[in-house]
Amino acid sequence: MRIVDINERLAISGQPNTDEFINFARRGYRSIINLRPDGEEPNQPGNDAEQAAARRAGLAYNFVPVIGTSITEADIQAFQRAIATTEGSVLVHCKSGTRALMLYALSEVIDGRMKRDEVEALGHAHGFDLGRAVTWLERQAIQTPRVSGFFDPRTSSIQYVVTDQTTKRCAIIDPVLDFDEKSGATATTNADAILAHVEQQGLTVEWILDTHPHADHFSAAQYLKQRTGAPTAIGTHVTEVQRLWREIYNWPTLSANGSQWDHLFADGDVFNVGSIKGRVMFSPGHTLASVTYVIGDTAFVHDTIFMPDAGTARADFPGGSARALWSSIQTILSLPDETRLFTGHDYQPSGRHPRWESTVGEQKKANPHLAGVDETTFVALREARDKTLPMPKLILHALQVNVLGGRLPEPETNGRRYLKFPLNALEGAAW
């Protein structure tokens, strides 16, 4: 196995045997990064075996599985984090070393330490063909809009800043207001990270959009509106969710007319992010009010389709329907195959890094809930799976905030705010 030194901290290689890990430690490496998805080849060791071998050798270990033809910025960020969080020398491997060098080159270009026209020469200097990296950079340069994802590990949610690079105007989608259910504390860490990005990039926020009233996190829409002055929006069917939860919460004073948002989008409505046209698709199933935002060559599909290795979202919340979810997914999959899809959650199957971008074509080919599956099979699969899932731990906390557009309850006479929980209102207890 050939090891290629790229710089004083980074070396790359093809697939090593796990019995070589102890020798890597003796040679001074401190960390192994495995870029190979499990199952690429019948004889590869796999994530579990490599992790165990690294532990025995006293090496740090990171699993960042990527496919050379579908690398995303989330993959590049995970690669960068894995290197940055390790002291000392790092050995990165894939099958041949090409993906490892490709991720390094893309990282260097994105961070401004390397010019695009230097990528191929880097590959040739080390005996690799980086043509795919060049193609990736060329494709990224013409993608519209530019999408930046912000992963919240507490709720496994992804928040987005969607930017028109020409006008420097942007939309924020599904922002998270931090909440700790043990202490009852709220914070704006996630939202402030988004604001810092907006300021750093010199952007003007044109929209603050929620895809649906979330059951697993509080929306930061109101906080961001206060900070930016941008209007908030959601799908018009939010009124049905408000009426449903008004009854569950026994909340007769809740105005179930959607007035908590500045704009309600109907199916087919159009809007702009700078000079880029956006379109709203009604996508019920996960909730009664879910919408997909199609902006340029992207679609923000919230809790309908997860990453191809993670299947689809649940449909057993009050007002949910597996059959409606199937129909919504089929509408999404009718978009062009090259459409970039951005999901609302990633639960990191097999312990991999967070990912959130795929394409329509990738979903059709690789998602086990969709590839070769018909409606009847999907509904049976989805309903059976949902029966095994407990309710989200924040559903009763979050909905009373999110049906108000992200507003916290008003303070009571002692100046404190309170949440209200109905008992025995929902099925799905995990005893």
Swiss-Prot record:
Its cofactor is Zn(2+). Substrate binds at D309. It comes from the Bacteria. InterPro entries: BLH_phosphatase-like, MBL-like_hydrolase, Metallo-B-lactamas, Mito_Persulfide_Diox, POD-like_MBL-fold, Prot-tyrosine_phosphatase-like, RibonucZ/Hydroxyglut_hydro. This is Beta-lactamase hydrolase-like protein. Induction: Repressed by BigR. Could play a role in cell adherence or biofilm development. Belongs to the metallo-beta-lactamase superfamily. CDD domains: POD-like_MBL-fold, PTP-bact. Part of an operon that comprises bigR, XF_0764, XF_0765 and XF_0766. Zn(2+) binds at H212, H214, H286. Keywords: Hydrolase, Metal-binding, Zinc. GO terms for molecular function: hydrolase activity; metal ion binding; sulfur dioxygenase activity. One of its GO terms (biological process) is hydrogen sulfide metabolic process. It is an enzyme of class 3 (hydrolase). Its EC number is 3.-.-.-.
